[in-house]
C-alpha cells in the first residue's frame, strides 16, 4: 500500500502545476506520513489479503455519529460476522463491485486542498482589514499531535469511499442489512488499504426506519448495537421467506459449491448465522422455599448487560450477575406446585455460550435524587482472556475460552454528551485505535487505560470477546515475545545519547537507563533481568566531551570486539518470563511450606487439646475416687441412727435389743409394783401386754447409777468418744460398740416407757 500511495502522490504532484510558483513553495505542502502508513511500511505491505482483514478505513463523523462509527468498526473486524454478511445471500459479482468503486472511490489532491485552505485564510484576513470591520483574532497555532488536526489531514489526503445502494446486484431489497453489506463489500474490494468511508447512505436508511435516530442528539452505542443485530436478523429472515427453499446439493458437488460462493453465485439461505455468532441462552432458576420445587425458564440474549461495583472486575460483575436473589414481600414468586405466592430464590446462569460475547458495562445509572442518568466512573478491570464460570451443569462447551478483540470507549461526563472511539485487535497488525476518520496503531497495554480510574473521563463501555483456543493463545504469546526480543535487540545496539556502545558491552546499561516496562506485572521481574544489572554511580565510559577530574591513567590496549552473537542481549521479556516462572515456583513452594506449617500447627493444637482433656478426665476421676473414699471413711466413723446408711445387720440387732430392753424394763416395773402392793396390802396391777407378737426372752439389765440415769436434753442419741469416763463399761464389754449402743438405746426407751406409765 505504501508503494501505491507514493506513486499516487507523485501523480498528484505532477498533475497540479502552479503558475508562477517556485519549487521552494511546494515543500510545506508535502504530505506527512501517518503512523499507520509507517507501520504498514515497516511490516511489509506489498501483499494484500482478499478477505479485507488488512484494510484500515476510518469513518467520517456527520455531527454526532461517532456511536455508529465505533460499532460498525467492531462488527467489520469480527471475521465470522464479516464473512457471513459478505456471503448472504450471495457475493456481489466482481464486475459490479468494480463499477461501483469507480464511481464511489475518490482520491483527493492534498496540495490543492492545502492551497484552497491557504486562499481562504488570506481572504479572511483581507476581509478583516477593511475599514469598519471588527479586528480579526490572530489564528491559533494548530496542535499537530491533536486528534482534530489528524482527522483534518486525513480528510484532505486519504481516499474517500462513498457507498450507494447496490442491493439489486445480489437480489435483495434495500434495508439496513443491505446498506451494511455495501460498506463491507466496498472496503474489501478497494485497492487501497487506507482511506475514509462516508456512511451517509447507511445513516439515511437508519434514520428512515428508526425515528429515535433522526435527531442530532447524542445516541447510545449499546442501544445502536442491539438495534443493528436485531434489524439484521429481521431483514435476513424476511428475505429468506421470499425465496424458495433450495434443495441440498449432492455430496460430490461440495467443492464446486464452495467455489461458486467466491465467484458470486447463490448460497444456501441460512438465516441462523447471527444467532450462531451472537446469541446465547440464559436459564432462570427459581426455587420455592416452601416446597423446594425448582422451575427453569430460558431466555435468549444477544449481549450481556452487567451491573458495576467500585474496584471490581468483569469476573466479579458476572459473579454478581449470577448471584442468588431473594423473592419476598411484594416480589414473591407464584409457585405452580404450591398454587400461590411464595418466597423463593432466583439466580441466572448461562446455558449456551455465544461465539462472540458482547459485554455491556452499565456505566449509566438512573438516580432518584437527580431524576436522570448519571455516569459511573468505577474501576472495572477486564482481562485479555476470559472463561465464564456461571454456566449450568448441562451447558454446551462450558470451558470455552474467549479473547478480547474490541473495546468501545465512552469519553465524557454523562450519557447525554461525549464521544465514542473503538480499540480493535486485527489479525496481523496488532491493536488499532479507530477515532472516526483517524486510524492509528497503539500498543497492547493501551487497552488497559480505560478501566475507569484514569483521568480524561474515558471508560470502557462495551467489550467484545470472541472464542479462541489455548493453542492460539500460546502461539500469539510466543510471537509477541519474539517481536519484543527483536525490538529490544535493535534498541540495545545504540545508546540513548546517540553514541554507539562497545561491542562487548551491549548488554550493560547504567543504573538510570534500566528499561522500564509499562505492564505492571513486569516491574518485579527487572530485579532478576541479566540485561540491566545495578552499576556504581560513577561513569565507566565517559563521552568524548567529558574530562576526568583525576590525572589520566594509562589504559591497556583495547580488547578486540567480541562477536555480537556471543554476547547477544537477553530479551527482557524472556528474562521476565523466566523470573515469572521462578517467582511462581517460589510462591508455590512458599504456599506449600505455609500450608505444611499450618497443618503441623493444627496437629499440635489438637494434641494439646486432647492432652488437656485427658488430664481433666484423670483429675475428675481422682477427685471422684477421693470423694468416695472420704465418704466411706465418714460413713464408717459416723453411722446414722436409723440405719439407712449403716449396716443393716447392725440396725436390726439394735432394734431387737430395744424390744428386749423395753420388755425387761416393764417387767421390772411390774415386779416392783407387786412387791409394793404386797407390802402395802393393795391389789396388784396387771402388767401391760408386750407389743410384739412373738415374745423374746428377757435379758437382765444392769442397774444404772443416778448420774448415768439422767436423760439427755435432745431426743437423738449423742455418741461420745471412747476415751471419756462416761463409758468405761463399753471399753470393757466384749461386744464393743454394740453393747454401748444397746445401753443408750435401752435408756432412751426406758425414758419414753417411764413417761407413758406415769
Swiss-Prot record:
Designated name of the protein: Probable ubiquitin carboxyl-terminal hydrolase creB
Pfam family name, one: UCH
Gene Ontology molecular function, alphabetical: cysteine-type deubiquitinase activity
Positions of transmembrane segments: none
Residues at the active site: 66, 419
Sequence ranges of Pro residues compositional bias: 554-563
Biased composition (Polar residues): 253-268
Annotated function: Ubiquitin thioesterase component of the regulatory network controlling carbon source utilization through ubiquitination and deubiquitination involving creA, creB, creC, creD and acrB. Deubiquitinates the creA catabolic repressor and the quinate permease qutD. Also plays a role in response to carbon starvation and the control of extracellular proteases activity.
Organism: Aspergillus niger (strain ATCC MYA-4892 / CBS 513.88 / FGSC A1513)
EC number(s) recorded for this UniProt protein: 3.4.19.12
Keyword field contains Signal: no
